[in-house]
Amino acid sequence: MKKSTSLSALYLASMLAVGLSSCSSTHVEAPAPLLPVPESKQVEWQKMETYAFIHFGLNTFNDREWGYGDTPAEVFNPARLDCEQWARTLVAAGMKGVILTAKHHDGFCLWPFAGTDYSVANSPYKDGKGDIVRELSEACKKYGLKFAVYLSPWDRHQANYGTPEYLDYFYAQLRDLLTNYGEVFEVWFDGANGGDGWYGGAKETRTIDRRNYYNYPRIYEMLDSIQPQAVIFSDGGPGCRWVGNERGFAGATNWSFLRKGEVYPGYDKSYELQYGHVDGDQWVAAECDVSIRPGWFYHPEQDSLVKTPEQLVDLYYRSVGHNGTLLLNFPVDRNGLIHPIDSANAVRFHQIIQEELKTNLVAGLTPQVSDERGGAYVASALTDNDYDTFWATTDSVVTADITFAFPSALRMNRMLLQEYIPLGQRVKAFTVEYRDASGNWQPVVLNEETTTIGYKRLLRFSSVVSDGIRIRITDARGPLCLNNIGVYDAGEQADKLFEEVQASKMQSFPFTLAGVNAESAAAASDRDEKTTCFVDGDLLTVDLGSERFVSSFHFLPDQGEPNRGLISHYELSVADADRQHVREVK
């Protein structure tokens, strides 16, 4: 009885405090924006959260991922192509939009571009009268999806690729897509550029200056003048960035910043993009691209290898839930349809997410907070389900506690946190705690570091049953601005599924190697099995940059020369926070 009474008193006290501050401070200014901040179109883009990729073209029929550029256009002949089937499937799977590969690296165009004969206009599809870009654009309008285009800068078909003349051809393609197919929400530029190709029959390897050849500033100017609402994707943005992998996840630490001018399409330090640049001066949030199958294009032998709904759910939590967006690819099959296995798994994935995050246990509750700015920026804004209202601290306060008390103990295993990103990304570290049966606060055991929040942070943890939960912001770049908090019970199977997924995945932190030159050290983290870092001596120091939660250590021996540099015995030690004391890990 005493416990129940104290909880009620706590709840009433928090309500009273909020009411007094709201009445007494009606002209409080919002916190000043903390640079860099997003453009409004970048905020709207991130609110989409999940959207689809469609890879479809000659590669679908020649069983390749990267076509050489010499497959005849006549090979393209989908018998039952139905863009409305694509749109219906994507809506049922919770996708908010779709990006179509209008032209992949092989140079084949899915629309009748007048500048080439290598397009649907010279294929059997609809007797050369088809236009898949238009068909999908119209299907999107009918079913309420946003539409976007992928256009490969690299073209293995064009004879003049690598010359200034090719740029005129490429710019004309881009202008055609931007002016004739309605509004697009994104334009996608691939980082794969230059290499071997057909090139009009030359059959040779061509290299380009990936940073300067395409004159991206001119391209961006064209895009902004024709489709100002569109977000531009490339390795370095400027609208949104590649996340640095094609496995669909961002780092648990993920800043929406990059250092301006440093990252470009084909950037050779792509591992940085998984985490962003904490010292960046340009807002470029991460897009996490992944295919529902092993390949980006359809291959019949992969029908049994489609990602399960549970695997897709895991990717959602590690992309959207790690301050990114999820771009999920659907390889359209040779009939011109999204395969039924892909469709069923994607729809079930969406249903699971809806089920797990259906009921917010703190909706409408006003938490007790250790600091409050007042005016409109009060604690009640954290649970009012309004994106544009937010709680904020006073200017000098960069740490705070947010405490929820429940009338009785509840089971919980999911949490949602959101910062109000129009004013910038701020939080650098936080913890989550629950109140045990004795009234003491205990840490919620999480499988990942709790550093950044950004647009959205989703946390999964083994169920706790408690009458109180607390979020403690322990470090930030400036005064805090949070607009939503959610706490959920994902159901009885949540713990089992969560544990199974955790056992099957691995996520690496960025690191530097002491005593190893930069070129050799890069080989240790580039995820390329063909490169190897060799170390002189028998001591290797791995610097993680800051204190981290580490659950395992993995290394891959040299794959080129199996007998070179193999480790037969080793000891692993870790340094304390002050880096003065080292202890062996047993």
Residue positions per predicted region:
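C-terminal motif of bacterial Sec signal peptides marking the signal peptidase cleavage site
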Residues: S21-S22
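Noncatalytic modules at the cell exterior or secretory-pathway interfaces
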Residues: S462-T474
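Extended extracellular/luminal ectodomain segments enriched in beta-structured repeat modules
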Residues: V398-T399, P407-R414, S466, G545-S552
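Mature catalytic domains of secreted/periplasmic carbohydrate-active enzymes
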Residues: T26-V398, T403-F404, L416-Q425, Y434, ...
